[in-house]
């Protein structure tokens, strides 16, 4: 129930400062690479802490995506560059890729 509430809050709340950006560029590559590395690092860290494979996968993905969403929230302040759904999409793509690469290297 809490997850549904948080997702609803994020999707239904308005953002006063949106970014006017494109789908490509150096910024997007940085989001992708950083999220991939954070996801793989989160997976590896949680495995070393004794978590199961499923839990470590969830931890790594959520760790990476939550940091990406936090960065976008920081950007949405009036002095920032604005919230970018495109940046967040690249964060999710990078986190998924980082998880996949981490899984492939573990076998």
UniProtKB/Swiss-Prot annotation:
A Pfam family it matches: DUF2279
Transmembrane spans: none
Position of the signal peptide: none
Domain of life: Bacteria
PANTHER family referenced in this protein's UniProt entry, alphabetically: PTHR35462, TRANSMEMBRANE PROTEIN (PTHR35462:SF2)
Protein name per the record: Uncharacterized protein YfiM
Organism whose genome encodes this protein: Escherichia coli (strain K12)
Gene that produces this protein: yfiM
